[in-house]
Amino acid sequence: MTHLFTHINQDGKANMVDVTDKNTTQRQAIAQAYVEMKAETLALILNGQHHKGDVFATARIAGIMAAKKTSDIIPLCHPLALTKVEVELVAEPEFNRVRIQSLCKLSGKTGVEMEALTAASVAALTIYDMCKAIQKDMVITQVKLLEKTGGKSGHFTSQ
């Protein structure tokens, strides 16, 4: 089976996909990321003792802002009028990590997977940035698309 990269034209050059003739549908994507850290670092965040302030609130806002700016940082992404962006951060002390889940929605001609992935990634990077003075060996891991709905390719759920 041949798979074609939609962002590469017949000449092998990168280009933005033409979505002019695509149908407008309800689209949604959910992505995740994890930030693994020492128990002591997580405790500082959860106890509100971090010297830079509320780490989760800052990461949540950063993720939302990033989703809205995805087309500015991912070269071939279409600028989208997102109708919903949600970023949820959940501490998992039993695993010494924070789970980040983002959701993006719109009614449009192209999907919101990159926006959801960008939101989760930037929220994770923000946690790293705010905590790097305390711990430099944190690990951002498992950044992935969990689910997407809408559009020609239909429903996708990560295994």
Swiss-Prot record:
Its EC number is 4.6.1.17. The active site is at residue 129. It is an enzyme of class 4 (lyase). GO terms for biological process: Mo-molybdopterin cofactor biosynthetic process. GO terms for molecular function: cyclic pyranopterin monophosphate synthase activity; GTP 3',8'-cyclase activity. It catalyses: (8S)-3',8-cyclo-7,8-dihydroguanosine 5'-triphosphate = cyclic pyranopterin phosphate + diphosphate. Substrate binds at residues 76-78, 114-115. InterPro entries: MoaC, MoaC_bact/euk, MoaC_sf, MoCo_biosynth_MoaA/MoaC, Mopterin_CF_biosynth-C_dom. It comes from the Bacteria. Pathway: Cofactor biosynthesis; molybdopterin biosynthesis. Keywords: Lyase, Molybdenum cofactor biosynthesis. The keyword Lyase applies. Coiled coil: none annotated. Catalyzes the conversion of (8S)-3',8-cyclo-7,8-dihydroguanosine 5'-triphosphate to cyclic pyranopterin monophosphate (cPMP). Homohexamer; trimer of dimers. NCBIfam families: moaC, PRK09364.1. PANTHER family: MOLYBDENUM COFACTOR BIOSYNTHESIS PROTEIN 1, MOLYBDOPTERIN COFACTOR SYNTHESIS PROTEIN A. Belongs to the MoaC family. This is Cyclic pyranopterin monophosphate synthase. It comes from Psychromonas ingrahamii (strain DSM 17664 / CCUG 51855 / 37). The lineage of its organism: Bacteria, Pseudomonadati, Pseudomonadota, Gammaproteobacteria, Alteromonadales. The gene is moaC.
